Amino acid sequence: GTGLTIGENVVGMDPEAVFKGGRIVDTVDLKRRVKLYKDYQHDGYGAIIVQANVEDSRLKVQEYAIGELGVECVELKWGQGAKDIGGEVKIKDLKKAQMLQERGYIVLPNPNDPNVIKAFEMGAFKEFERHSRVGMITEESFAKTVDGLRKAGAKYIFLKTGAYRPADLARAVSFSSKYKLDLLTVDAA
């Protein structure tokens, strides 16, 4: 079968997503994407893979996908893979920029600053930038994350990273082996 990865930030960018206590409890967009895949999945072959970055991890997106949507495969992400940037998106709507900041994203300029709001409304600038954080990994936090995903029911756990410094690449290989991940992707290597 064919695997299909649902990338990062799908839940955080979903204007209809519902959160409680800082966690996702309902999402139209992720449910739609998983359902579309499953509707065309043949005899259970293949897998839908839900990727997560720092913001997704904070919102417990993968745990929701496993527990509520029956997803069995998740992918952790270190950095932006092949891109040496932080996952920027342009936002042309003030309310959406404010919503994203409330969900924990870095939004520039600050969409809740009264001076920024006034400048935006006067046309001084036309868009905000939403940035994703680049996570800093310790072995302890990585082990805890993998253990939590396994306890949540993940059958397969992947890691995606970029072709970074040799020490960081060695860490990815070492952690993937030590914590028995199912796949390591080194993007743009």
Predicted regions and their residues:
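Active-site entrance/lid segments in N-terminal catalytic domains of soluble metabolic enzymes
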Residues: 1-189
